[in-house]
C-alpha cells in the first residue's frame, strides 16, 4: 500500500490492522471516484481564489484531474489496493505528476468532507434515475390504462374473488403509485442537494474557503452551512435516499407478486414474453417467471441496506469510522434496486392479457356488491340491502355482464371514471 496520508514519522503501520481498517474501501470508492475528482477540481479552484494556489498550479491540477478522470474511465488508471482509498489515490497521482501543487490540494479539506461531497453527488445522480424510471413505469401504465380501460378482470381482496374490476383500474393504480414514487425521489433529491465540501473534519478550518464557488461549480442548490450538521447528515441522507428508492421497489414487489399469481397455471390471466422466463435444469416442461421473482426479491436488498445504515447511526455527533460501512449498503441497495426498475417498463409494455381466462374467473357472486348498492339507492337501508345480497350472492350475476358492472362504477377513480387525464397531467408535471 502506498504511503498513508495520516502516517506519523517513526510509527510503524501494522499490515493486518491496516487491511482491516481499509476493508473494501478502495474497491467501493470506484463508484465515487469520478465525483471525487470533480469535487477536487472545484476545491482547487476555491483554493486559488483565496491565494493558496497560483494560477499556474491550478491550471496544472485541473489538467491532471481531467487526465486522471479519462484514464480511469478508459481503464488506464486502476483504483486498487495499493491505495488506502480513492482520496489517497487522487492526491498520490497529483503529487507524482505535479509535486508540491499536488501536496497542496488537501489544504482546508478533510477526507470527511471529501467523502461527504462525493457521496452527495452520487446520491443526486441515483435519485434522478429513480425518478426517471418511476416516470417511465407510470407512462407505460397510463398508456395501457387508456387502451385497456374496458377490459374486465377479476378484482381480489384477501386473494379471493371480490368484485368485477378492469385492466384500466389495475393499470391506473400502478400509474399513480409510480407518479408518487417519482415525486418522492425528486423531493429527496432536493433534500440531499446541499454542498458539504468545505466543512473539513466537521468543525471548519481557519481559512476563508470559497464555499459559494464550490456549491455553484458542483451544481448544488445550496450550501450545507453547519460543519456539525454536515457530519450528522452522513447516513441520514443516505437513509432518506434508500427510503425513496424503497418506495419504488416496494411497489415493484407488489406488482411482481400480482404477475407471479396472474402468470401461474392456476390463474392464467397473463402471458409473459419468453425472454422474461427461464427453464428448469431437470423438468423440461417448466417455464419459470424468474425475472419477476427476482424483481419481487429486490426490495429485500433495499430494506437490508436501510436497516444497516439505521443501525450504523447509533452514534454521537462528529465523524466516526463506523460510517465507512454505509458505502457498501447504498451501493448494494441502489445497484439491485435500479437494475430491477430498469427492466420494469419494457416488461409491463409487453405482457399480454388472456381475455378468456379473465372472463372465466368472473363469477356470479362478484356482482353482489352491485346488487346491494343498487338496493340502497332505491331506498333500502344499506345494512338490510347487504344482508339480502349476501343471501342471494350465488345468483347475483343473473342478467348482468362485466361491462355493465364496470359502466355503473362511476365513483371518481373507478372503472367508469378513471380520471386518466388528471393522472396524465400529474405525470407531465414531472418533466
UniProtKB/Swiss-Prot annotation:
Signal peptide limits: none
Recorded name of the encoding gene: argH
Family statement: Belongs to the lyase 1 family. Argininosuccinate lyase subfamily.
Pathway: Amino-acid biosynthesis; L-arginine biosynthesis; L-arginine from L-ornithine and carbamoyl phosphate: step 3/3
UniProt GO molecular function: argininosuccinate lyase activity
Top-level EC class as recorded in UniProt: lyase
Annotated catalysed reactions: 2-(N(omega)-L-arginino)succinate = fumarate + L-arginine
Protein name: Argininosuccinate lyase
Main localization of the protein described in the UniProt heading: cytoplasm
GO cellular-component term (any): cytosol
GO process terms (BP): arginine biosynthetic process via ornithine; L-arginine biosynthetic process
Entry's EC annotation: 4.3.2.1
InterPro entries reported for this sequence: Argininosuccinate_lyase (IPR009049), Fumarase/histidase_N (IPR024083), Fumarate_lyase_CS (IPR020557), Fumarate_lyase_fam (IPR000362), Fumarate_lyase_N (IPR022761), L-Aspartase-like (IPR008948)
Domain of life: Bacteria
Location relative to the cell: Cytoplasm
Keywords attached to this entry: Amino-acid biosynthesis, Arginine biosynthesis, Cytoplasm, Lyase
Amino acid at each position: 500500500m502506498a504511503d498513508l496520508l495520516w502516517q506519523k514519522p517513526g510509527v510503524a503501520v501494522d499490515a493486518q490492522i491496516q487491511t482491516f481498517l481499509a476493508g473494501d474501501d478502495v474497491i467501493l470508492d470506484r463508484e465515487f471516484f469520478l465525483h471525487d475528482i470533480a469535487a477536487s477540481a472545484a476545491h482547487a479552484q476555491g483554493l486559488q481564489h483565496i491565494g493558496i494556489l497560483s494560477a499556474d498550479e491550478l491550471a496544472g491540477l485541473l489538467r491532471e484531474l481531467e487526465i486522471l478522470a479519462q484514464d480511469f474511465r478508459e481503464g488506464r488508471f486502476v483504483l486498487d489496493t495499493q491505495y488506502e482509498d480513492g482520496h489517497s489515490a487522487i492526491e498520490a497521482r497529483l503529487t507524482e505528476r505535479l509535486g508540491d501543487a499536488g501536496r497542496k490540494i488537501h489544504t482546508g479539506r478533510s477526507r470527511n468532507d471529501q467523502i461527504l461531497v462525493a457521496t452527495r453527488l452520487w446520491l443526486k445522480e441515483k435519485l434522478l434515475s429513480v425518478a426517471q424510471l418511476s416516470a417511465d413505469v407510470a407512462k407505460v401504465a397510463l398508456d395501457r390504462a387508456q387502451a385497456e380501460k374496458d377490459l374486465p378482470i377479476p378484482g381480489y381482496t384477501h386473494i379471493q374473488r371480490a368484485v368485477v374490476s378492469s385492466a384500466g383500474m389495475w393499470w391506473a393504480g400502478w400509474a399513480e403509485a409510480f407518479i408518487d414514487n417519482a415525486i418522492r425521489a425528486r423531493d429527496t433529491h432536493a433534500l440531499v442537494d446541499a454542498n458539504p465540501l468545505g466543512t473539513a473534519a466537521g468543525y471548519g478550518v481557519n481559512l476563508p474557503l470559497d464555499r459559494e464557488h464550490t456549491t455553484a461549480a458542483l451544481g448544488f442548490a445550496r450550501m450545507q452551512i453547519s460543519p456539525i450538521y454536515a457530519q450528522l447528515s452522513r447516513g441520514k441522507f443516505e437513509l432518506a435516499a434508500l427510503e425513496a428508492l424503497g418506495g419504488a421497489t416496494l411497489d415493484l414487489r407488489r406488482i411482481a407478486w400480482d404477475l407471479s399469481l396472474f402468470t401461474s397455471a392456476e390463474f392464467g390471466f397473463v402471458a409473459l414474453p419468453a425472454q422474461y422466463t427461464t427453464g428448469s435444469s431437470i423438468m423440461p416442461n417448466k417455464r419459470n417467471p424468474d425475472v419477476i421473482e427476482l424483481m419481487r426479491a429486490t426490495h429485500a436488498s433495499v430494506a437490508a441496506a436501510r436497516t444497516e445504515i439505521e443501525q450504523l447511526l447509533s452514534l454521537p455527533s462528529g465523524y466516526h469510522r463506523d460510517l465507512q460501512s454505509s458505502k457498501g449498503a447504498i451501493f448494494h441497495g441502489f445497484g439491485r434496486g435500479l437494475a430491477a426498475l430498469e427492466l420494469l417498463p419494457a416488461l409491463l409494455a409487453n405482457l399480454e392479457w388472456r381475455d378468456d381466462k379473465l372472463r372465466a374467473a368472473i363469477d356470479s357472486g362478484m356482482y353482489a356488491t352491485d346488487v346491494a348498492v343498487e338496493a340502497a339507492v332505491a331506498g333500502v337501508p344499506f345494512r338490510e340491502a347487504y344482508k339480502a345480497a349476501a343471501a342471494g350472492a350465488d345468483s347475483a350475476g343473473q342478467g348482468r355482464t362485466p361491462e355493465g358492472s364496470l359502466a355503473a362504477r362511476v365513483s371518481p377513480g373507478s372503472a367508469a371514471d378513471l380520471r386518466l387525464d388528471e393522472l396524465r397531467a400529474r405525470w407531465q408535471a414531472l418533466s
